[in-house]
UniProtKB/Swiss-Prot annotation:
Belongs to the AccD/PCCB family. Component of the acetyl coenzyme A carboxylase (ACC) complex. Biotin carboxylase (BC) catalyzes the carboxylation of biotin on its carrier protein (BCCP) and then the CO(2) group is transferred by the transcarboxylase to acetyl-CoA to form malonyl-CoA. It comes from the Bacteria. Disulfide bonds: none annotated. The gene is accD. This is Acetyl-coenzyme A carboxylase carboxyl transferase subunit beta. Acetyl-CoA carboxylase is a heterohexamer composed of biotin carboxyl carrier protein (AccB), biotin carboxylase (AccC) and two subunits each of ACCase subunit alpha (AccA) and ACCase subunit beta (AccD). Keywords: ATP-binding, Cytoplasm, Fatty acid biosynthesis, Fatty acid metabolism, Lipid biosynthesis, Lipid metabolism, Nucleotide-binding, Transferase. Its EC number is 2.1.3.15. NCBIfam families: accD (TIGR00515). It comes from Rhizobium etli (strain CIAT 652).
Amino acid sequence: MNWITNYVRPRINSMLGRREVPENLWIKCPETGEMVFHKDLESNKWVIPASGYHMKMPAKARLADLFDNGEYESLPQPKVAQDPLKFRDSKKYIDRLRDSRVKTEQEDTILAGLGKVRGLKLVAVVHEFNFIGGSLGIAAGEAIVKAFERATLEKCPLVMFPASGGARMQEGILSLMQLPRTTVAVDLLKESGQPYVVVLTNPTTGGVTASYAMLGDIHLAEPGAEIGFAGKRVIEQTLREKLPEGFQTSEYLLEHGMVDMVVKRHDIPETLARLLKILTKKPVSAANDMNGGAIALAASA
């Protein structure tokens, strides 16, 4: 026991009235360097108030924000094999899983819920980027497949919010197997006649982009999101060319026809509701806002 650390320092701190400062009390905007109080950021849906920069939004917060009154049924996390390859790099994979579970309070990167958005029933699937980079492994793949099956059973649309670096390297070929599995799940939902909409968030890359993230009937994207397969630096080194400014951003992909709409986070629930009501042929209130025409155009494309 270190008596200075465990006894003397706490006594001095209490005498002087000093308090331990929690981590992440202030959060720095990567774009402008602005410091934002964490509660202000959370209340603004993790969007920097001054610049409008969209920070990564926790999966639980996104589901609560999406569904009416924050009410939804959490879909169960399927049980799968843990660390089947007994993988180890600089750290044991099983330890990485344990640390990520403590950090995020989730079993794995995928959270799925069934609820209503502006009165319309749907299943939403969200990646938690803070869980090993939102990577796609066996557990995530199984959770996604089960979510598509539930949407098919409920005869309702599914909305996907990817945020991922791609396939989980610690699971090797078992991770890559999730690409065709999730692709088949998308096809089964579409065969049932239900819409599949993807809301691309920052970042959406790698094997996730190569599979279910780019198979939607309609693709929305948050402002400034990085979307692509390989990273910009890898592409530049391979081609030995400088890439255009803003390459792989949601705005660039919108301009080049890869994304249907770029939608601010605050507008996503309303935009999704309008789109899905058009796609499912349900009554839609008159679109008086500027996005009304774009929504109708995207849905009819």
